């Protein structure tokens, strides 16, 4: 325990908060190129084949990001936009691909929550 005098002289060091999406480097989104598109299984107790992509960002960092929605057109060398946001049951996946921008098309026949999946308004 420091004395009152030591606290007056030096003071306490304030805690720095850690970023949940460090690869974005304080940007809201970043562009990148898919290096690998594959499926992976979630941790217990869930069971599925989750679609994920390994993305090399414009700042040189390579991250694993989740492809949301039903069906996608992504393959190797596709240019995508990623945003922060982790997937709770996939360890190491801390980013989401933004649907409906760059090479990623929006989800087809989506009626609700369209803006989140890049779907146009149905006629």
From Swiss-Prot:
Keywords per UniProt: Methylation, Ribonucleoprotein, Ribosomal protein, RNA-binding, rRNA-binding, tRNA-binding
Keyword Ribonucleoprotein belongs to the record: yes
Any matching Pfam family: Ribosom_S12_S23
Function: With S4 and S5 plays an important role in translational accuracy.
Region ranges (Disordered): 104-123
Entries under SUPFAM superfamilies matching the protein: Nucleic acid-binding proteins (SSF50249)
Keyword RNA-binding: yes
Residues with 3-methylthioaspartic acid modification: 89
Family (UniProt): Belongs to the universal ribosomal protein uS12 family.
Entry-linked PROSITE patterns: RIBOSOMAL_S12
GO CC field: small ribosomal subunit
Protein name, as recorded: Small ribosomal subunit protein uS12
């Amino acid at each position: 325990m420091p004395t009152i005098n030591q606290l007056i002289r030096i003071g306490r060091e304030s805690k720095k908060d850690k970023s949940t999406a460090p690869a974005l480097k304080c940007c809201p989104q970043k562009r990148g190129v898919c290096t690998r598109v594959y499926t992976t299984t979630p941790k217990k107790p869930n069971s599925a084949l989750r679609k994920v992509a390994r993305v090399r960002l414009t700042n040189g960092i390579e991250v694993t990001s989740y492809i949301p929605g039903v069906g996608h057109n992504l393959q190797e060398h596709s240019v995508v936009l990623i945003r922060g946001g982790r997937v709770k049951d996939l360890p190491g996946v801390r980013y989401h691909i933004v649907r409906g921008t760059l090479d990623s098309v929006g989800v087809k026949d989506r009626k609700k929550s369209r803006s989140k999946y890049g779907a146009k308004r149905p006629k």
